[in-house]
Amino acid sequence: MDEEYDVIVLGTGLTECILSGIMSVNGKKVLHMDRNPYYGGESSSITPLEELYKRFQLLEGPPESMGRGRDWNVDLIPKFLMANGQLVKMLLYTEVTRYLDFKVVEGSFVYKGGKIYKVPSTETEALASNLMGMFEKRRFRKFLVFVANFDENDPKTFEGVDPQTTSMRDVYRKFDLGQDVIDFTGHALALYRTDDYLDQPCLETINRIKLYSESLARYGKSPYLYPLYGLGELPQGFARLSAIYGGTYMLNKPVDDIIMENGKVVGVKSEGEVARCKQLICDPSYIPDRVRKAGQVIRIICILSHPIKNTNDANSCQIIIPQNQVNRKSDIYVCMISYAHNVAAQGKYIAIASTTVETTDPEKEVEPALELLEPIDQKFVAISDLYEPIDDGCESQVFCSCSYDATTHFETTCNDIKDIYKRMAGMAFDFENMKRKQNDVFGEAEQ
């Protein structure tokens, strides 16, 4: 362990690896450690399949029908990338795309009255959708046109709406949209987990719907991308970036103590040695006394031998179950991927259902999602506590990431990364400033 570093990073989750990569590119001297022998922390992909069975204490191990264990890479935290979202921009600006291959997720679906429907997000799809009646379609189309033309710097596009003060509830009212359409707009397009957004100023919701439409416009089938070989590839891509710029990596390295002087971090002790630093980044598991519990998420990993019904036999898709449809406060999500993404044996599918826990019986809460997946070959149930830091770290210079939430995209994770960056660097994270080269995520790869 070299003595002096600008930044020490503990844990190789996605948030930590992206920050470590960005800090290295910015010329900081970085030491990155993880107590685990593998990359990814909470956001790793588990391989071989035997390892997943062990992790969930299923001692009998996988049956032969599951195929070769090495063909599996199972994500512990299910998320997709928005094609036009912040994580893709981070991948592009750092050129980490050169280490990864992506596929477009084949479909985005929403649950209504016990059935699933394709999410309409263009005028043409909206007019053809069975989700709404004829008059509702016309009103929804008007709303989509309004959102597409909306420009916060051009008051001529406002149509009497003030982006800073008009609530989203009032915007829906203005277009006379019914409850079902409001549900799917807020939850399947703007991707909110709850209905708290309705009474907030409408600008953020309008921008979220724009992000969905722009992401969809890039590749057509859905706005989501997924990396071949699983999400565990993402932290590793950023770890490579950090190493190229001189970052030092140590896996399987226990952390004995974080050393503080006068309330500020000065180093990390591991196996009797001390590495000194000016700033520390870590996930909540490294500093339990500096985080508080902010809720729980249940995630159920399901292995299937068939595509999900009514998805047109898609080999990947997302299903959103809006909370109002199942009398809840938070949405339920299903992410499905398969052998087509090199994460499962031939003919096998992985569907992960997740939601924010609201009761003392979390498994019952995700039942509406599990019903859509039947028959299920094997289930792995994980209930995780969500943690957030108790302070902003500016005084101690210890910057802690938040746990990964129940959403099925990385926008909230990217907000956390930008927020930590701002607190560490004293200035906002600027894509333009740092972007060295803009190219397509797919490079020359087929879509």
Swiss-Prot record:
Subcellular location as annotated: Cytoplasm; Golgi apparatus, trans-Golgi network
Main location: cytoplasm
GO biological process: negative regulation of axonogenesis; negative regulation of protein targeting to membrane; protein transport; Rab protein signal transduction; vesicle-mediated transport
Keyword Ribosomal protein: no
One GO location term (cellular component): Golgi apparatus
Keywords associated with the record: Cytoplasm, Golgi apparatus, GTPase activation
Pfam families (UniProt xref): GDI
Single GO molecular function: GTPase activator activity
Known function: Regulates the GDP/GTP exchange reaction of most Rab proteins by inhibiting the dissociation of GDP from them, and the subsequent binding of GTP to them. Promotes the dissociation of GDP-bound Rab proteins from the membrane and inhibits their activation. Promotes the dissociation of RAB1A, RAB3A, RAB5A and RAB10 from membranes.
PANTHER family according to UniProt: RAB GDP DISSOCIATION INHIBITOR ALPHA, RAB GDP-DISSOCIATION INHIBITOR
Complex and partners: Interacts with RHOH. Interacts with the non-phosphorylated forms of RAB1A, RAB3A, RAB5A, RAB5B, RAB5C, RAB8A, RAB8B, RAB10, RAB12, RAB35, and RAB43.
Family statement drawn from the similarity comment of this UniProt entry: Belongs to the Rab GDI family.
Name by which UniProt lists this protein: Rab GDP dissociation inhibitor alpha
Organism: Macaca fascicularis
Gene name of this polypeptide: GDI1
